[in-house]
Design a protein with these regions (language model features):
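Mixed-charge, low-complexity interaction segments
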Residues: 2-247, 312-329
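Active-site-proximal structural scaffolding
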Residues: 21, 40, 255-258, 272-275, ...
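Short, charged/polar micro-motifs that form catalytic or ligand-binding hotspots
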Residues: 29-37, 252-255, 283-287
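Long, contiguous hydrophobic alpha-helical segments, chiefly transmembrane helices and signal peptides
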Residues: 31-32, 39-44, 279-282, 293-297
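Hydrophobic/aromatic-lined pockets within catalytic cores
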Residues: 52-55, 255, 270, 284, ...
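Short cysteine-rich loop/turn motifs with clustered Cys
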Residues: 245-275, 297
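Histidine-centered nuclease catalytic patch
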Residues: 264-295, 304-317
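Short Fe-S-cluster ligation motifs
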Residues: 293-306, 325-335
Length: 335
């Protein structure tokens, strides 16, 4: 098992030694070196996702759709900037611009599923075309630059046609590349994944995606220094993973014995008709600790969103409920 030390003190990408002898792994590692924009990470991540589903041939369009789906939650839910802002206040990253454009076109929620996002992208295909095409200008070619150093021939970065031909020649005569490109133009341009690279990626999907996420988080944190716990904001967290169901069972036991009033409405919380949610929104504290979780009217949960509650009208009621929670668990061993 060969290890690639990423950024020396960072994530170690582990690839089976067999592939070290048959593929140019160092060139693969270079695919995320010196990015100018975040969508370089999402490009490789989308490719790995597609290959893990045994997709051998795709297009720029399909890859970019996957990129939008993968970045959607971070941008929409937490307003994360993928590559910072320009001096004039405009968004720098083309992928982020595509997401913001789709937001204006549709009523798709921040926590929409991948399938829902892909369906809406297709619905607004014409409107998104120009924004998506901007993402194809350099990254698909620059991502392979780490392999080009093996060739004495220099790449002509000024011509897509000549770059496509150059990539084909490198693949045929110098070293096998993860993908080559077809002759069509724009978003319809074909992407062909090499079978041996597909096998390597499928055998090492978890390690590779872990490495991509590590590099992505480093980049995003540098561009969003004010955002805490950014690693938890890349995708919606599964409620089972967060174990909120256990907290709900605890409150359910208390509701069988005592009256608990909703912090916001003052009305009694009824068994099986409430949600467990955070008093201080999860995006601020980045944890699901018991002190911050409370039962509340399920009809109000969505409108509460990620806004901080006003202190004076609500904290006293919240504190009284929390006191009841801890008092009840001490006095009733069955809860």
């Amino acid at each position: 098992m060969a290890e690639r030390d990423i950024a020396k003190a960072g994530y170690q990408l582990k690839i089976d030694g067999f592939y070290e002898n048959t593929l140019e792994i160092e060139g693969f590692v270079q695919m995320m070196k010196d990015p100018s924009y975040c969508y370089k990470f999402y490009w490789l991540e989308a490719i790995v996702d597609l290959i893990s589903r045994d997709v051998a041939e795709t297009t720029f369009d399909e890859i970019i759709n996957e990129m939008i789906a993968n970045a959607w939650y971070s941008v929409r839910e937490f307003h994360i900037h993928l590559s910072g802002m320009r001096a004039d206040g405009l968004v720098r990253d083309g992928l982020e611009r595509a997401i913001l454009q789709l937001t204006k076109l549709s009523d798709l929620p921040a926590n929409a599923s991948r399938v829902e996002i892909l369906n809406v992208i297709k619905e607004y295909d014409k409107e998104l075309k120009q924004t998506k095409e901007q993402l194809t200008h350099m990254v698909p070619y620059r991502a392979l630059a780490g392999f080009f150093s093996k060739s004495e021939e220099k790449a002509d970065w000024g011509s897509v046609r000549r770059l496509t031909e150059y990539i084909y020649r490198i693949n045929q005569t110098v070293t096998v590349l993860p993908y080559t490109l077809g002759e069509r133009s724009g978003l319809k341009k074909e992407v062909y994944f090499h079978p041996v690279w597909m096998k390597m990626i499928q055998d090492n999907t978890v390690n590779i995606l872990g490495w991509v996420q590590y590099e992505k988080v480093k980049w995003l944190q540098n561009n969003n220094p004010e955002v805490p716990g950014l690693i938890y904001k890349l995708a919606p967290m599964d409620e089972k993973m967060r174990k909120l169901s256990r907290v709900r069972k605890l409150w359910e036991g208390i509701l069988q014995l005592y009256e608990v009033r909703d912090v916001y409405t003052g009305k009694p919380v009824l068994p099986n008709q409430y949600d467990v949610d955070h008093f201080i929104p999860w995006s601020f504290v980045m944890n699901d600790e018991l002190w911050n979780l409370m039962p509340m009217d399920s009809s109000l949960n969505s409108s509460k969103s990620n806004r901080l509650p006003k202190w004076d009208p609500f904290f006293k009621a919240f504190a009284e409920n929390q006191y009841l929670l801890y008092q009840s668990t001490q006095e009733n061993s069955g809860i």
